[in-house]
Amino acid sequence: MRIKLELFGASRDFSKKNHLEIEVQDKASIKDLRHEIILYLNENFKGNENFIKIIKSSTFCSENNEIINDNYEITKDQKIGIIPPIGGG
């Protein structure tokens, strides 16, 4: 399945576009999607640890703008948003 991953906040550094297209297996979970994103980052950004930390600490939201957890099952091609943590110093 093809996921259009909408990028927000710090995750916008992952692409020149405002999204990534990620392939996942049928009935993948958000946990599986998170793993595929990390593989993408390892391949395209040489394992940038800051980017990987962003992925590990981000929340995801469905097409209906609902927060979804790592067990959420992806059953079709769809848009999913990634919402990195917001922090300051």
Q: What positions do the PLM features span?
A:
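Ubiquitin-like/PB1-type beta-grasp interaction modules and other compact soluble beta-rich domains
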Residues: 1-88
